[in-house]
């Protein structure tokens, strides 16, 4: 592959992944909102509570957190220790930022692989109210990890070609 095309390909994959995550988050938040409003409505007007609504909302919130983290990676919104880095001159500052991003990438690879191993190990465990495999709840970590890897990779490529 021509290395000149890498930044464009990386950016395209990053943008497609961002769009997919945004659509997923809109759907997740919409479903979560409807379920919670319906639950509150039933509880206060009819003194009836759904056994599964809080569990669904909890798992949707977990999915939203991991997916949303990839958008925070793309836009550099995660907490960072910039005080020390900003004291460096431009050359070393760029090198430190590059090493930090590569370290984050390596962490995310381990996080994603570890998350997949945990999800697989818990595939036979059922959730308390819904009785579906906990694999799907724990799958949020590796899926979010993949989307974060895509975004940090794109950031590394962008920094490399500057």
What are these regions (language model features)?
Residues 1-162:
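Alpha-helical transmembrane segments and membrane-interface helix-loop junctions
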